[in-house]
Amino acid sequence: MGFSLSNFTSDPFAISTVSFGIMAWVVAIAGAASSKQENFPHFSWWGISYQIVIILIIFVLYANNNIELYKFTLVGLVSIAFIYTTNSTNNLIYNSNSAGNLCCAAGCILLSILNLIWILYFGGHPESPTNQFIDSFSLRGQGHEQLGSGSHNHNANNANNNIPIGAGNAIIGKGEMSPYDDRFAASGVNQPTSESLRLASGPQMGNGPFTTTGAIINPNLQQPLSGSIGGSAHHTPTNINNNNNNNNNTGYMTSSHLTGLENFSSPHVPGSGAGAGLGVGAGRDLTHNSNGGGGGSGGGPASANNSNNTNKRNTIYTDSETGTGITFRYKAKALYSYDANPDDINEISFVKDEILEVDDIDGKWWQARRANGQVGICPSNYVKLLDT
């Protein structure tokens, strides 16, 4: 967050209040300097000195464009200054008839008004009517919501725009994913295109060779370095550049980053069945009754029948029918009722106090199975693990 005067000059509220504060402080310090010290309250010197420090701090924060990060701190600091200036005003007016003291009292009154305005602004919510009215005059258009320098925000936006799928702190290729709500990642705004899905599930991600199921391949051993995320077939690239071993930007994914939102099934994406995301050996989408899958042993495209059942959510499976190989080791009780997102075929609905079987409880979304056999994912903050 670089220091720039343009950050300060583009905010009329910052210019007006800081300029007003400096003028009021000059009036106060001039009156204090011209008054007779035997009749001047000595503690007021500390109040005047403290006030100029607060004004300079606010100026620096505006110039660095990180005023929002210290709003609550400023409320406390300015509140102390407000006590100092009001107390000095009382002592200077009623305990002395000196012209210098009265001049200093006038400056302290102006500083008290300024401090009160700062307390109301910095202590108010950004969406409050007063704050929105003040921020509407900002030349930046968004008030102080955009923190940091322009290049910093530009890079952050580019990183978020390159997020292909899924959730949480994963690094795929050279795009860094910031932690955020998985439900937001699954919304229509951030849905990946078919091209990004093809690149994400192809044999290579970033600069490192991958299997079709996401496991990293060692170019020397031609074997996965870690357990396969799902599916039974691996596709090893034939042309691998060994210089990639020394590249720090090799993409990777770990099991903690998989929350079930990675499950997609597309006839254009090899190995993209539910088996590639949830570790389902049969490579099937658990939300519709179809025996075909994109993550089969051949790694070929999904059958055309799968596309006809994409939005079916109410198919129920028994243990013998699913063939998922998932062991549900825990039981959880639903704290609230939850209606599945119709845009996400992997979610399941449940009602309050319903008992669910769950597994893979590390992320925000857990694999779950209802009592009727329906399998999918559920939000972890809607359920509570039971002692078994």
Swiss-Prot record:
Q: Where is the composition biased (Low complexity)?
A: 239-249
Gene Ontology CC annotation, any one = site of polarized growth
Which Pfam families does the UniProt entry name for this protein?
SH3_9
Spell out the SUPFAM superfamilies in the cross-references: SH3-domain
User: What are the protein's UniProt keywords?
Assistant: Cell membrane, Membrane, SH3 domain, Stress response, Transmembrane, Transmembrane helix
User: Which of the residues are on side Cytoplasmic?
Assistant: 1-12, 64-65, 123-388
**Composition bias type Gly residues, residue spans:** 272-282, 291-301
Q: What GO molecular function annotations does the UniProt record carry, in alphabetical order?
A: actin filament binding
GO BP terms, alphabetized: cell morphogenesis; cell-substrate adhesion; cellular response to neutral pH; cellular response to oxidative stress; filamentous growth; filamentous growth of a population of unicellular organisms; filamentous growth of a population of unicellular organisms in response to biotic stimulus; filamentous growth of a population of unicellular organisms in response to neutral pH
Question: Which residue ranges does UniProt annotate as crossing the membrane?
Answer: 13-33, 43-63, 66-86, 102-122
Return the Polar residues bias intervals: 250-266, 310-319
Q: How does it sit in the membrane?
A: Multi-pass membrane protein
| Localisation | Cell membrane
What is expression of this protein induced or repressed by? Answer: Repressed by caspofungin.
Task: Say where the protein is mainly found.
Answer: membrane
SH3 domain span: 327-388
Question: Can you state the subunit structure given in the record?
Answer: Forms homooligomers.
* Function summary: Plasma membrane osmosensor that activates the high osmolarity glycerol (HOG) MAPK signaling pathway in response to high osmolarity. Mediates resistance to oxidative stress. Controls the activation of the CEK1 MAP kinase. Influences the molecular weight and polymer distribution of cell wall mannan. Involved in invasive filamentation into semi-solid medium and plays a role in morphological dimorphic transition which is a differentiation program characteristic of C.albicans and which is known to play a major role in pathogenesis.
Family in the record: Belongs to the SHO1 family.
- Protein name (record): High osmolarity signaling protein SHO1
Instruction: Give the originating organism.
Output: Candida albicans (strain SC5314 / ATCC MYA-2876)
